[in-house]
């Protein structure tokens, strides 16, 4: 087991009715002037936005609102939020939504804390943040794990770049997690969320370093739990217990727990998907599902023991005559699972058809974003990235 630092400062209020605690928790963490950031009209129609505002009003906390966050959140909305927050003396950012809203909130918090700099410089790798305004969330979509993570991803539509920035400064102060708020999600969004949750753990699982018996057991248990409940929700979308299991898994999958003792993870499936999201605006979890089988078949021989372990302990594969046979059976079983929950496993099923030139462009951009090469299961260079994209055709 490699050495690690595990830091998870987010206070979680989980369960039915927890939304009503937002004012109490905001006071506890010193928020006095709050930007409520949200996405589309679902937050309004569901009543959750009114519940949040009522709780803040009862706690005597000033608030201003900014909606309009879209999936693969845009840099332009972040800049709008920074200016609105400055004009209103905002000292705390509250996201009401899923990962896209929380990520947009984190980016606003970075920009607000260092107004002399362009916030995109963080995502472009040009500098590191020195400060960040406090952030919290009322979670309405279980997927990204941003409610407890140090990560946020923003899309620059001018350059068609989707980039991540990770820093503990942006870990939320608290997270309100009521599974009932996810009941009205469309099935596709629910299942894409489950794919995203699983991938956050799988990125940390498929590594070539560290001996992590306990961490592996936690990761495998989380993956089996999400798979089971994803199938439950596919046929019974209002099942509270299944919603609760998936929501809690969302947080544990991306707060660092399932990577303790490893080298930090592989992260190439995410980076490959980021290019697809930047160019084609695909749903993130669905894009990850589409990428993973091709990536896995490209790298598995270089990380064979982990793929065998995954096949047996997570996918329930009976060991074959050879380790390679077992690993490939595990990958095939994963594809079958994705299909059972309505997730794509290639470009066609994802609904995009990139040209050879676009795949080459995505590979070049991906290589630039990761400094030329990246990966733990197998270190990938630009030519490898392009080869994987071609496998998705």
Cite the ranges covered by each PLM segment.
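ATP/NTP phosphate-donor binding region
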Residues: 1-92, 347
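Fold-independent oxyanion-binding glycine-rich loops
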Residues: 10, 16-17, 39-40, 69, ...
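Short Gly/Thr/Asp-enriched flexible loops that form oxyanion-binding sites at enzyme active sites
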Residues: 51-52, 82, 101-115, 148-149
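Glycine/serine-rich anion-binding loops at beta->alpha junctions
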Residues: 90-106, 140-146, 279-282
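A glycine/threonine-rich phosphate-anchoring loop and its flanking beta-alpha core
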Residues: 114-211, 309
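Active-site segments that bind and position negatively charged phosphate/pyrophosphate groups
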Residues: 204, 208-333
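C-terminal charged capping/lid subdomain of soluble metabolic enzymes
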Residues: 307, 314-393
């Amino acid at each position: 087991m490699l050495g690690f630092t595990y830091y998870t400062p987010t206070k979680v209020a989980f369960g039915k009715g927890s939304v009503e605690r937002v004012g109490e928790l905001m006071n506890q963490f010193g928020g006095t002037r709050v930007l409520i950031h949200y996405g589309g009209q679902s937050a309004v129609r569901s009543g959750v936005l009114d519940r949040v505002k009522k709780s803040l009003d009862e706690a005597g906390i000033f608030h201003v609102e900014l909606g309009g966050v879209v999936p693969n959140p845009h840099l332009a909305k972040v800049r709008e939020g920074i200016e609105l927050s400055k004009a209103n003396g905002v000292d705390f950012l509250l996201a009401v939504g899923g990962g896209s809203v929380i990520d947009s909130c984190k980016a606003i918090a970075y920009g607000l804390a260092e107004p002399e700099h362009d916030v995109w410089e963080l995502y472009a790798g040009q500098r590191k943040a020195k400060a960040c305004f406090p952030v919290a969330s009322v979670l309405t979509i279980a997927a990204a794990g941003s409610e407890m993570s140090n990560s946020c991803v923003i899309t620059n539509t001018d350059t068609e770049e989707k980039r991540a920035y990770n820093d503990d400064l942006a870990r939320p102060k608290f997270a309100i997690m009521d599974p009932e708020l996810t009941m009205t999600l469309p099935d596709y969004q629910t299942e894409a969320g489950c794919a995203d949750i699983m991938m956050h753990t799988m990125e940390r699982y498929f590594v070539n370093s560290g001996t992590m018996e306990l961490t592996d057991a936690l990761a495998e248990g989380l993956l089996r739990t999400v798979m089971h409940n994803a199938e439950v929700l596919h046929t019974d979308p209002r099942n509270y217990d299944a919603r609760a299991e998936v929501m809690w898994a969302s947080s544990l999958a991306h707060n660092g727990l399932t990577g303790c003792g490893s080298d930090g993870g592989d992260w190439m499936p995410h980076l490959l998907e980021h290019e697809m999201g930047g160019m084609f605006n695909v749903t993130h979890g669905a894009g990850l599902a589409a990428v993973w089988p091709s990536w896995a078949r490209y790298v598995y021989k270089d990380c064979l023991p982990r793929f065998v372990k995954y096949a047996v302990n997570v996918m329930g594969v009976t060991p074959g005559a050879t380790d390679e046979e077992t690993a490939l059976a595990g990958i095939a079983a994963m594809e079958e699972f994705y299909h059972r929950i309505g997730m794509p496993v290639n470009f066609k099923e994802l609904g995009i058809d990139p040209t050879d030139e676009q795949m080459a462009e995505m590979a070049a951009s991906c290589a630039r974003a990761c400094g030329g090469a990246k990966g733990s299961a197998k270190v990938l260079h630009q030519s490898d990235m392009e080869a994987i994209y071609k496998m998705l055709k």
